[in-house]
Amino acid sequence: MNILLSNDDGYHAEGIQTLATRLREAGHCVTVIAPDRNRSAASSCLTLMEPIRVHQLGTFDYSVIAGTPADCVHLALNGLFETSFDLVVSGINHGANLGDDVVYSGTVAAALEGRHLRLPSLAVSLVGKQSEGHLFGNNHFETAAQVVLDVLPKLVDMALPRQILNINVPDLPYSAIKGMLVTRLGQRSPSAEILKSQDPRGSTIYWLGENGSAIDNGEGTDFYALAHDYVSITPIHADMTAHHAIKVLSEML
């Protein structure tokens, strides 16, 4: 397959480099285009008010200077390359993209951007203990890469254009994974309050509070799958219409 690979942790992150290596070893043609720095939680932000610069780092490797994940995929699918791609893969993200995380996630946003050319897309995340955006533990990126290799043939068989799968993989050895579950997005409680402090010069600064804990995490959710050592696979789409409210709202107005 001809695969476009991006992420939000940056070109030099271990996750994307591990996945690129494994996909190429499996015989896939992989073009990597990723931000030159960490752009976690950039969501679908696009750079519109200034020019974008792209650096070529290898035959099929590129970084976008100060770009976002959505910038990377948008550029790749809209004229930067002459190549025709079969699939967009985003990841391996260093941390979870569960429940409400997908709204903010640059990893998921890169996959969503693949819909422009009706391409199926995968957003892949490794879920372990996390603090301040960094994973702690064994960091089994090889496990997540193998899961992607397991899923790819099945995705081809589905033959569904614009299908987006949000995949979260437990940070465990591959042999310890119990299987894969198709799930829905769970839900987190509201984030913790902001943290207020002062910089060395006495100016007030703020940090956003930590993610809320899972409150909708029952059987069938992505949170449940990860808590029980399963890979979570959630089909998602970009249509944000609240279809159930259309009739009620029409009658009210």
Curated annotation (Swiss-Prot):
Keywords in alphabetical order: Cytoplasm, Hydrolase, Metal-binding, Nucleotide-binding
Cofactor annotation remark: Binds 1 divalent metal cation per subunit.
Cellular localization per UniProt: Cytoplasm
Known cofactor(s): a divalent metal cation
Enzyme kind, highest EC tier: hydrolase
EC number of the protein: 3.1.3.5
NCBIfam families: PRK00346.1-3, PRK00346.1-4, surE
Name used for this protein in its record: 5'-nucleotidase SurE
Species this chain originates from: Haemophilus ducreyi (strain 35000HP / ATCC 700724)
Gene transcribed to yield this protein: surE
